[in-house]
Regions:
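Glycine-rich beta-to-alpha active-site loop
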Residues: 1-40
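Charged, glycine-interspersed solvent-exposed loop segments at helix/strand-loop junctions
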Residues: 36-131
Length: 134
């Protein structure tokens, strides 16, 4: 299946010519932590971070999540991705993937307009070649 999901979308946005193969899926979701990952992170770091309880950890986690989100949004905006599109990608419940159509991706400037399709056999060997989603 041809797809670019989750963190791959950040790599796509970093490109100069952002093209996707016909029929490829581009999937976005909001950041999240699974409960088991949170528990492990807390147990592994509570002493070095001086978290006296899970509420201290929660305070740190909230702050860290907001800082990480700000960095992500700043990067995507610097790459020219439309703000409303980014907000839409954050409105989905955790672990749900959003698959916008090609027109939406182009209008949001996540894929380069007028260069949205990659031929099946790659002929462009330039350093600005697109991400191949296989």
């Amino acid at each position: 299946e041809k797809s670019c999901l989750s963190a791959c979308v950040i790599l796509l946005a970093a490109g100069h010519k952002r093209r996707v193969r016909q029929g490829a899926l581009v999937g976005l979701h909001r950041p999240y932590w699974r409960q088991a990952s949170l528990e492990k992170y807390y147990e592994d770091h509570k002493e070095e971070e001086s978290w006296d309880n899970v509420f201290a950890f929660s305070e740190w986690l909230h702050d860290d999540a907001l800082l990480s989100l700000a960095e992500y949004l700043e990067f995507m905006l610097d790459q020219g991705v439309e703000p409303r599109f980014l907000l839409s990608s954050l409105r989905f419940r955790k672990m749900l993937m959003w698959y916008p159509d090609r027109d939406t991706l182009a209008a949001a400037n996540l894929i380069t307009p007028n260069e949205t399709t990659v031929p099946d056999k790659e002929t462009d060997a330039s350093p600005h070649a697109e991400i191949s989603m296989r």
